[in-house]
Amino acid sequence: MHLLGPWLLLLVLEYLAFSDSSKWVFEHPETLYAWEGACVWIPCTYRALDGDLESFILFHNPEYNKNTSKFDGTRLYESTKDGKVPSEQKRVQFLGDKNKNCTLSIHPVHLNDSGQLGLRMESKTEKWMERIHLNVSERPFPPHIQLPPEIQESQEVTLTCLLNFSCYGYPIQLQWLLEGVPMRQAAVTSTSLTIKSVFTRSELKFSPQWSHHGKIVTCQLQDADGKFLSNDTVQLNVKHTPKLEIKVTPSDAIVREGDSVTMTCEVSSSNPEYTTVSWLKDGTSLKKQNTFTLNLREVTKDQSGKYCCQVSNDVGPGRSEEVFLQVQYAPEPSTVQILHSPAVEGSQVEFLCMSLANPLPTNYTWYHNGKEMQGRTEEKVHIPKILPWHAGTYSCVAENILGTGQRGPGAELDVQYPPKKVTTVIQNPMPIREGDTVTLSCNYNSSNPSVTRYEWKPHGAWEEPSLGVLKIQNVGWDNTTIACAACNSWCSWASPVALNVQYAPRDVRVRKIKPLSEIHSGNSVSLQCDFSSSHPKEVQFFWEKNGRLLGKESQLNFDSISPEDAGSYSCWVNNSIGQTASKAWTLEVLYAPRRLRVSMSPGDQVMEGKSATLTCESDANPPVSHYTWFDWNNQSLPYHSQKLRLEPVKVQHSGAYWCQGTNSVGKGRSPLSTLTVYYSPETIGRRVAVGLGSCLAILILAICGLKLQRRWKRTQSQQGLQENSSGQSFFVRNKKVRRAPLSEGPHSLGCYNPMMEDGISYTTLRFPEMNIPRTGDAESSEMQRPPPDCDDTVTYSALHKRQVGDYENVIPDFPEDEGIHYSELIQFGVGERPQAQENVDYVILKH
């Protein structure tokens, strides 16, 4: 128990001195390196959980004093409440703060600063001592070079130079050297001043070659002025394939056939050591050649080529530079190479003479189809413009200092050209007529390549029964020329050949030469028979009108055209092939109205009350456009159409009429035409009744006075009449023979009317017996009259004078009398006459 007491006390004191470590956390590098005169930068962080830092002391090699319960040692830095720093503490700077940063800087640092630095930290309730190791050397310590595990030639590697020192107040630089010479590659330098590490590092990337093997690489530490401070060196171990060199006897490697050649392979470097040896010619390994010496005895031209030796190690095979062995020999049989073959006519061609020879040929002899080409001694022959005769076989002979070669088989030059001398040949017998079948062939003289097709122009729906033959069915008149082309890769056209097709005249037509305007009656007219073409050109003309031959000249002339010359004209043109008719051409003659006449419908005699139509008929071209009507007095009537319609027609309308027609050419008039209008039966009856009534009244008075005196005469007269008559009643209308028509000239008496002539009208008055009824019409009276043997009849006649007033458009000079004269015809019946009544019936006739 007595032994444990002091130790327990020591532990308690230690605990009190260091407080609770779980409440303080520090981060900083464990060891820092520097050298005399340099500086030290101590990056440091801390965390005090119970409050801010109140006191900080930096000790050098601190030791805890148990007696005083404090740390003893050299105080390099101590913070004071008034902020004053002792003079000896100026090289040490506390760069931290009161809660987390405890960074320090010592500048300059001395050798005796090596050891342990103690950071005494105190807060209000806690205390802590943190220790940091400082290693200060007398001289600058060297950097350390780091190499990759293996270095191979031509593979990029990174060399690293590391120095465990860095301080803001003391700049340094790291320099790379190869065999004491600064390296050209740029290095990348970096520094670290963190709580984890403090260093300066330089990295260099380069691709080592086999020649770098065994070379010394140096990393040199320099101050800011480039002054050497220290360095580190390493020897490069570059793995590489064997590096070889060939030696040849003879040294120029030029021999003639039959000579001997020796080649020796020497290894200048290999890392690691080589294992196998081989020889190659033109990239191909030579069999059974596994030594460093290659002996070639009695070489031939085939042994010419590129030789090299190959030695292998664990890295790979290494090859020497190639040695070109030239075995000289005379030219071999030559061959000809033709550039641009087959050649097109007109293009350029180049010939190349190829002959294996060593040395190269210096002179050439050229042959065309076995004949030497004079002046051609070069390796190449150039023809700027090739022609068909250049085609053929070309060969050559080469010559060098060792001899002359032999002529090879040669090369064939194919000169291609379009078909030559192409012609179109007509196979038909001449001449060719329109509608014939024509056969043509396309011929040519030569062609290379052969003709494969033919073309024809103009194009048409024609038949090609065989290649180069054209058959034209039903040849047209206008097939003037035909041309053909023979084609291979190109087409050559022949000159057009004229078919000279003979045909009948074409496009025959009638053309009016004069007059240039409309044709009027009386004009001089010329018609021309035209046609567009005819082959042969000798032609004849024929004129036709309505199928009647007129003439045989090319022109048809009318000195004075008349309407009768109008009609449909056509002309014919013929040659030895045939004839062609023109289309019918209508000759139209314009003339004034002529041959006018007035036609009447239904006739020239019309009963009053009916209708009469007078038509003015004419012959005119152009047709009549205007009509004018005139009466017998040349008075113009207010009618201007072709037809004059009278409805109802009156007796006053009787007379002579004429018409006049007008067109754009002129006028024409018709002769007089007479219209006769006669009375209707009703009018005649009325007028006869009136006339007879008047006559009867006068006659009765006369009869009464002369009754007895003339009784016997009437009896005798009546008996005479009975002997010659059937005793029937009758009415006589004397028709007067029509007068000769008046002259064509107009007259003042109007139109002749036969009804207006002097005439005698008869009527019979019948006196019936007593108590027998009487009718007023003639027909009933006739049917009811007694037999002739018992009928007493008196026949009266009325003579009418012609009156001037009966003519239209004529006014009488003085009043006229009735112009009626009466007479009596007495018919005595057979037997005794019955007692008659005393009354008398009258018939009066009036116009």
Curated annotation (Swiss-Prot):
UniProt record, GO biological process: B cell activation; cell adhesion; negative regulation of B cell receptor signaling pathway; negative regulation of calcium-mediated signaling; negative regulation of immunoglobulin production; regulation of B cell proliferation; regulation of endocytosis; regulation of immune response
Membrane topology: Single-pass type I membrane protein
Cytoplasmic topological intervals: 707-847
Domain Ig-like C2-type: residue ranges: 143-235, 242-326, 331-416, 419-500, 505-582, 593-676
Location of the motif ITIM motif 4: 840-845
Domain of life: Eukaryota
Cited Gene3D superfamilies: Immunoglobulins
GO MF annotation: an example: IgM binding
InterPro entries: CD80_C2-set, Ig-like_dom, Ig-like_dom_sf, Ig-like_fold, Ig_CD22, Ig_sub, Ig_sub2
Disulphide-bridged cysteine pairs: C39-C167, C44-C102, C161-C219, C265-C309, C353-C396, C442-C484, C529-C571, C616-C659
Annotated ranges, domain Ig-like V-type: 20-138
Function comment: Most highly expressed siglec (sialic acid-binding immunoglobulin-like lectin) on B-cells that plays a role in various aspects of B-cell biology including differentiation, antigen presentation, and trafficking to bone marrow. Binds to alpha 2,6-linked sialic acid residues of surface molecules such as CD22 itself, CD45 and IgM in a cis configuration. Can also bind to ligands on other cells as an adhesion molecule in a trans configuration.
Family annotation (PANTHER family): B-CELL RECEPTOR CD22
Subunit structure: Predominantly monomer of isoform CD22-beta. Also found as heterodimer of isoform CD22-beta and a shorter isoform. Interacts with PTPN6/SHP-1, LYN, SYK, PIK3R1/PIK3R2 and PLCG1 upon phosphorylation. Interacts with GRB2, INPP5D and SHC1 upon phosphorylation. May form a complex with INPP5D/SHIP, GRB2 and SHC1.
Free-text comment about domains: Contains 4 copies of a cytoplasmic motif that is referred to as the immunoreceptor tyrosine-based inhibitor motif (ITIM). This motif is involved in modulation of cellular responses. The phosphorylated ITIM motif can bind the SH2 domain of several SH2-containing phosphatases.
Protein name per its UniProtKB record: B-cell receptor CD22
Gene symbol of the encoding locus: CD22
